Amino acid sequence: MSDTATYTPRLRAKYTETIRAAMKEKFGYANDMMIPRLDKIVINMGVGEASQDSKKIKGALEDLEAITGQKPVKTVAKKSIAGFKLREEQVIGAKVTLRQDRMYEFLDRLITIALPRVRDFRGLNGKSFDGRGNYAMGMKEHIVFPEIDYDKVEKIRGMDIVVCTTAGNDEEAKALLAEFDFPFTN
């Protein structure tokens, strides 16, 4: 076997070694399976101009693949909307669902590298939870990720990032993400 078989992402190790114990102590869970954990991270990049020119989606797919290390899935319009010149089944964006090690690696890069590079960054809004333990945030520029070469980018795009947890409510989810060093402002 190679060394990669024993590799554990930094945040996964932090979760198993310190975060689980801290969460169990703070909320008093009866057993270890009740402790919230990260389930998945979904990254969505909408490409509205792809409805006019289908070649525009290619750059978004390549950038999303470079950022996540996983091939994105094209998202299509569910129904036609004449006002937006949109047809049903037309490609309008791309998304990636990250789980396991790739999820922890992406989260590590997001917290330690990408968020500090965001212009005028003052922290994340602590009220962007959905009531069921999931946190959603938006980024206006995808070039803050180190995998993106600024000179080769045809257009700066935004992206939506949703962090899904197994927490039952927002309080537990916020405590979990705060343990992962999410820079919440409130």
Swiss-Prot record:
Biological process terms in GO annotation: translation
Keyword annotations: Ribonucleoprotein, Ribosomal protein, RNA-binding, rRNA-binding, tRNA-binding
Database matches in PROSITE patterns: RIBOSOMAL_L5 (PS00358)
Molecular function GO labels: rRNA binding; structural constituent of ribosome; tRNA binding
Subunit structure, interactors included: Part of the 50S ribosomal subunit; part of the 5S rRNA/L5/L18/L25 subcomplex. Contacts the 5S rRNA and the P site tRNA. Forms a bridge to the 30S subunit in the 70S ribosome.
Free-text function comment from the UniProt entry: This is one of the proteins that bind and probably mediate the attachment of the 5S RNA into the large ribosomal subunit, where it forms part of the central protuberance. In the 70S ribosome it contacts protein S13 of the 30S subunit (bridge B1b), connecting the 2 subunits; this bridge is implicated in subunit movement. Contacts the P site tRNA; the 5S rRNA and some of its associated proteins might help stabilize positioning of ribosome-bound tRNAs.
Family stated for the protein in its record: Belongs to the universal ribosomal protein uL5 family.
Protein name, UniProt field: Large ribosomal subunit protein uL5
Organism phylogeny: Bacteria, Pseudomonadati, Pseudomonadota, Alphaproteobacteria, Maricaulales
